[in-house]
Structure formats: C-alpha cells, structure tokens
C-alpha cells in the first residue's frame, strides 16, 4: 500500500512494473508443434529486449516454458483455457449458467495444480473474453466459483480477469480479482485509470497494440503513461 492508499504489486517487498507480452504457442515454421528449442529462443529473445513478463494467452503453456521462465527470471500470468468470444450474443456463454461450472472449474484446477510450484507464476488469470456482462457473484457464475477456489487454494498469488474487475477493498473473499486489467483501451482511457487516485487496485493493460501487418500506432504514448505513472 502506498502513501495514497493504493495497492501495489510487489515481489519480495519490491515494487515492480510488468513489461510484458502475450505469447501464443505457435511457430512460423512448425505451427503449434513447437520444440524446446523454439521456446528457448522465444524467452531468451524476450530477455534480450527487456521483456520481464508473459501472459500465456489463452491457455496454460508447455511445462518446459515455466521451468525456463523460473531460470531466466520472467514473470508468468498463467491463463485458464476458458474463452468463448460469444459474449455479444443473447446466448452469452458461459455467463451465469451453472452448466459451465464443472468444465471451467476443471480447467482452472488443472492449471493451478500443475503450475503452482513454479516461482515464475505470479498471477492466475481466470480466462479470456468469455462473458461480456456482469452476473451475480454466486454459485451459478462459473468464474466466481473458480476465483474463490483459487483464493482458497493459493492466496499468495494475484487473480485477474479483464471481463470482471469487481472487488471489495480489504476483503478478497468478496472480490473477483486482485488487480484491475483492461483490453484495448485508448491512451486517454488508460491515463484516466492510472491518474485517478480513487482507483485503489494495481492496473495492467493485458492486451493492447494489436496490429495486422505494420498498422500499429500509439505505442510510445502508452509507454509514456506506464513510465510516468508507475
């Protein structure tokens, strides 16, 4: 907690800033059949360019990657394989339908139990872009169940889910997340978030700068904000 009463992400008592990237397990030559050599090349190149964090978008990665991240000192946001992209339609999956509880919980537990002993893992992500509305925080909502299970199983790590940033200060059991995250916010929106002293949670722009070809823009403007408002 800083002097303004805002929470901070700290590792071993030291405040940190994630300089991260989303990483899919694909290769330009081998497709999804990537080798240990491919993974090693990826992570060593990231270290070379001062990338210190990876979000495993959007599923747990090859176990070899986590051991290498432990060795190289790269933080991991480990993401549950729960994604639908159907949130904009009336059938909204998985939403508040209890039929999805078992499958989402199974994937969450498999990830946590497999990767819990890796010191590189500092964040558990509940999923990606599945459920575009806010539902009651009760046993019918699959992500409420999974976030409460994570909190009980491993309270030492941070929980995140950019589709549901509800939290109650001082009571993690009444919160969906421990860190606020967003995707594809504009520069002005990001600056408003980080300069508003009423926002108490740490903040991550978990997806931005997505481009096809060379159409990327505003990268410097984003990073000016990240560096000026750490």
Predicted regions and their residues:
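N-terminal carbohydrate-binding accessory modules
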Residues: 1-46, 67
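Substrate-binding/catalytic cleft of secreted carbohydrate-active enzymes
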Residues: 45-46, 53-230
